[in-house]
Amino acid sequence: MSTHLRKLPGLLLCLLLALPAWCLGRLFPIIGAPVFAILLGMLLALFYEHRDKTKEGISFTSKYILQTAVVLLGFGLNLTQVMAVGMQSLPIIISTIATALLVAYGLQKWLRLDVNTATLVGVGSSICGGSAVAATAPVIKAKDDEVAKAISVIFLFNMLAALLFPSLGQLLGLSNEGFAIFAGTAVNDTSSVTATATAWDALHHSNTLDGATIVKLTRTLAILPITLGLSLYRAKKEHDIVTEENFSLRKSFPRFILFFLLASLITTLMTSLGVSADSFHYLKTLSKFFIVMAMAAIGLNTNLVKLIKTGGQAILLGAICWVAITLVSLAMQLSLGIW
């Protein structure tokens, strides 16, 4: 059997799991399709007996379909629009990202958490949730159970943010503009940002959704420097002495991140020439669906019992990151006079 045909059963299995997960994600956006895909994959893995037939396809999906999803994610980014509208929130974005990464780095040893999981929780909390985890996992060569753990933690605090932040913003007396920046900088995933801003708009008859989404998209651009930095750090760590002979920037930097940037540039150029942003809608949707497929594959490769037993430290780290990001976002708004 050819290599491509050997991958087909695993690909089809991931596709079959992704379809109901996608539908469930549409019904319950506060949870999201990627989380449903991981859960379905982990549940099936408990009693699935045909791993030899599907192993190659599942592995291909969790790696290459995931990388393709990240590339297609770039078609949702108009760099001109993001930079024009998002510049006001840039100091807050930089502060919250730096805070989460420092917290994750500082607490990893204290919590006795593996480096990859701590990195994924920090990156996912600070940048763009599941998409950031998807982009970072191949760079640091994270295992599937580490990815599943990080996604689960991020989902938990996404849900809490969507439920609590509208009331918190009202209690603190945030303006509509202030809440848009707060939601865009302190909530992890795009779907949760949308849910949080929509809940605020329903309470206040406002339109914070557009502003929150653009702030969130500005955060997404941090994928580029963060993944580059992590890939260089990992490459240097794997070599005791970095010389021209044993270190190559081209080999260290993941190509799919370069294609992500290229996709963003294409979107920016085409929209500046008058092409409607809606023209890229199908590519953005395909990106989201590929992430769901990849999460199904990751779920299939994850031991649910082990995840439950070892997930406590990751949840604690996620909680500390979440609280730290929330406080820094609000403090920066106050200091900049936006609040």
Curated annotation (Swiss-Prot):
Matching InterPro entries: UPF0324_pro
GO cellular component terms given for this protein: plasma membrane
Keywords: Cell membrane, Membrane, Transmembrane, Transmembrane helix
Predominant place of localization: membrane
Membrane topology field: Multi-pass membrane protein
Residue ranges crossing the lipid bilayer per the database entry: 25-47, 60-79, 84-106, 118-140, 150-172, 256-275, 290-307, 314-336
Compartment(s): Cell membrane
Tagged with keyword Transmembrane: yes
Keyword Iron-sulfur: no
Family the entry assigns: Belongs to the UPF0324 family.
PANTHER family: INNER MEMBRANE PROTEIN YEIH-RELATED, UPF0324 MEMBRANE PROTEIN FN0533
Name of the protein described by the UniProt record: UPF0324 membrane protein SPy_1056/M5005_Spy0779
